[in-house]
Amino acid sequence: MTSPRPPVNPETTADLGTTTDPGTTADPRVSLLFDSREKPVLEFANQAGAVAAACHQMAIRFHQGGKLVVFGVGGPSTDAQHVAVEFVHPVIVGKRALPAISLTSDVATVTGVAATSGMAAIFSHQLRYLATPADIALGISTDGNCASVLSGLLTARELGMLTIALVGGGGGAIAACPAVDHLLISSSADPRIVKELQVTTYHVLWELVHVFFEQPGVLAPGVVA
């Protein structure tokens, strides 16, 4: 037999976050926090067609033997590693692993290139020696003005790679670059919100690539193994 549970003491549970003060949800700062995310999320949803188009082209490249090459500076450098592992080691059991690398993982190479050729060359240099025309370049930038990412995308275009950019704010110089095949913008000036949306974006990219792989005839006759 189990013992009866002791009565709840509101004074102690409040400190544990188990009660809600109605006054806190009415605080305009709380509303502002959520409202600031509503418009960017809706604008992202309106890019569904653009996201699907990018994923279809990614799936075609993977099907033809290409790999995904991801890069970004600062916070986006960890996103690049996150994206790569999502494809190489899917979190969902049964999904096929797909080849992907992050150009931010090799610290020795990144710092070596930066020391001799400058930060702007850290991705373009690696792409010239690690990528092929069959591959996919995915550049991530919070504000769209990262010189290293822009240079990487330009080099990827020269190599004949499929180019995709995830950018924030108004898109910056990367959005204006003709070397980008697929541009996905997280429309917010707040880098925290941009980060949240970009994580969602590349999770959707991963999921839709697999959707295309699972549809017979979408990529080519007999594509589904």
What positions do the PLM features span?
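A short, well-structured juxtamembrane/interface segment
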Residues: E43-Q64
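Glycine-rich, small/polar surface segments that engage phosphate groups of diverse ligands
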Residues: Q57-A131
